[in-house]
């Protein structure tokens, strides 16, 4: 990149002694080069005219883009539950949950339309959190789409009536059990425990450890209760714990490092 925001530069010389030519282009400072490289090529004749850029560098960046396409990163603080509670215009274009989860109902409707088995799985997962839940559904009313929940008592609620914890459970259920044509490389969620009862945190932790929709899951948490559920897999080496402290290097903790201190305790006990 250049020293000015919105400008990019790179050299074409890749071997010692080779004549160098610096190519410059405009970039979107809020997006990575990988995601906008195709547009950069098409909008800059001088860059597209370089075989090195058009073939070698482009292929490398496309390979990187394909890899990072498998990354799903979400932050609990950005979930907009107020927006999620509102009826939505029916759309079938949303493949993934937005960063703010505002398109939850449309994504749910699309997934259930494409795969009835996924709907059954999603419903069963929610019943682990809410045992008296009988059925969930997305229904139309006045050309708007509404997500509804039916309880064993016969009471029905839409998302405007349920608690913040219930909304959070719905979001995490979708993220962790999202149907994919191919396995995701990484699912990252910042503080998934927010607004969740400790008992629900354990359920969500089990979802993460048993889901087959991603190769790795990265969780940042301040909750000892949430950590507890990962104790057994941590002992077996299937869960890694990293400690972040200001002005210190990130430290990975293994079971061997703390076996004596942990004893018969659970992971969360180290932070209580």
Give the role of each language-model region.
Residues 1-124, 128, 134:
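Electropositive, glycine-dotted interaction segments
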Residues 125, 135-272:
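Switch/communication elements of ASCE P-loop NTPase nucleotide-binding domains
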